[in-house]
Amino acid sequence: MTEVKAPPEIFDARLLALRRARAAKRQDSFLMQRALSDAADRLLDVNRNFGKVLILGTPSIEAELVSKLPKEKFAEIICCETLEQLPQDNDFDLTLSLLRLQSENELPGAIIQLRQNLKPDGLFIAAMFGGDTLTELRQVFYKTDEDIMGGLAPHIYPMANYTQAAGLLSRAGLNQPVVDTDRFTVSYGKLETLISDLRDLGETNVLKERPDTVLTQNYWAQFKKNYQKMFSREDGKLNCSFEILWLTGWSPHKSQQKPLKPGSANIHLGDALKTMKS
């Protein structure tokens, strides 16, 4: 009998929990505020209220989201800070996760778990950082590692791209899967502000294979020089890219519209285009 191997642990779960606990005591991240506003807009576009809602995140997220929506949108909310705290119930109308899943060791399993919490025709929505996030920071780490240490060390963890995110939804068995992206660039007056924004989310380096020594003042001095040289604007501010992937899907239900089989359309593409032009 073949032994099933556990997925590799990319993240230090203990350190991640500690960082997130500290982040909960800090000011709300502007990145989380952006995700919350976008989530509220998406929920307002859904023409239904949700009786029972499961949120993967901190209680502050629950309060912020509720404040942006009509009172009748949610009847009952259960908020869990970790996957281990998720209930066994499968009767939720909505499961929602904001900027948490990118740090899960077993991302496919996490989405499957949240999908299993849904009742038929329940809605899954998640926002997580995508592969273009912190691309400038990543490249500056590469350059500085080479300059100072003569080799590369792990600093920023890998993140899913658009195609991978779509595959995760299909693998979880969600119907009508949709992935869209929110890409934006932030200009920072100094590097310390960028680091502070990441700490506000608890998203600094929690890789299990992270360097076991503290980066020196000499390293950070060279890092700042490299960042300024490689990714600064004319006014001296530092550019940093972010990408938030939005994943949406529905728990299967017989009432849902099914995609047509190839060749089953009852109108030709040419006729459709003529109709559009007329």
What are these regions (language model features)?
Residues 98-103:
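Short catalytic micro-motifs in class I SAM-dependent methyltransferases
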Residues 127-191, 201-214:
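Conserved catalytic/acceptor-binding region of the Class I
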Residues 1-49:
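Class I SAM-dependent methyltransferase Rossmann-like catalytic core
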Residues 60-72:
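Conserved SAM-binding loop of SAM-dependent methyltransferases across substrates and taxa
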Residues 40, 44, 172, 189-278:
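C-terminal lobe and adjacent flexible extensions of AdoMet/dcAdoMet transferase-like proteins
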